[in-house]
Amino acid sequence: VIYSHHHWDHASGGAVFADTADFVGHANMLSHLEMPPNSTTLSDVIGQYAPVAALDANDNDRIERGEANGNISDSQFRAFDANGDDGLNGAEVARGPVSLVHPPNVTYENELEITLGGKRVRLEWLEEMNHSFDMSRITFPEESTMMVVDYITFGRLPFREMDYENGMFQEWMAAIRETEEAAKDFEYVTTGHGPLGNWENITEWRVYFELLHEAVAAGIAAGQSLEEMQSNVEIPEYEHWGGYSWLNENVLGMYHFLTD
């Protein structure tokens, strides 16, 4: 089992293969799966999982299943609930819904090549960047195929607030540009979300970020508030992409990248 990174929607459920399989991922995946300190409160949670933390309607620093119903799925609730007590504390929410992720028993630091079915599979670490610190780019040389997950997506805007709490936008862009060049050696590029493509689709993804950066930076320079920018910023070249309704959240993320 080869992991791109630790996020629940790409890494959950591997335990069914635990009797026979090795689990391969970057060494940083292990730290991502660690539980934050018990002292972590729901009010400490920012960014991607802040909406989950906000479900604490009775303000007891614990999210009961009844508070979560209708807001997150049952399977996602169970993925947050590391201790299985049918409630979510601050540490569980801050860590994310990764309780169903089987940890890797084979890890690497910079790059790794393995053989599956007589064919090479290469994993390359993309260094610490915004989406996660354990991201692997996976390539299949014989198939001329590169796989990139989450930090690049085709035909869809970046997910919601873009994990701005990690504060590593420039590192994210560096990984995108480096991948854009590397992808020119491959016929196919496949992503964790979206259609099959090639290096030109990575260019489209990069240009979106550049346009978003330019628009938000201009709004800041003009003295606009975040709310004004969320109302005013439009990127019509990408209106046909999926997730365009997330643009106001993308603006929020870029605003934090530029001001925090």
Pin down the residues of each PLM region:
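Active-site HxH/HxHxD metal-binding segment of metal-dependent hydrolases
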Residues: 1-55, 62-113, 133
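Metallo-beta-lactamase
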Residues: 113, 120, 124-211
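Solvent-exposed loop/turn segments at secondary-structure junctions
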Residues: 6-11, 29-32, 94-95, 114, ...
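Alpha-helical scaffolding segments of alpha/beta enzyme cores, especially the outer helices
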Residues: 16-19, 174, 211-214
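Short Pro/Gly-enriched beta-strand edge/turn motifs at strand-loop
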Residues: 93-96, 117-123
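Divalent metal-coordination and catalytic microenvironments
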Residues: 5, 17, 23, 108, ...
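Accessory terminal helices/loops
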Residues: 58-80, 84-96, 130, 180-186, ...
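Short loop segments at secondary-structure junctions
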Residues: 21, 28, 118, 141-144
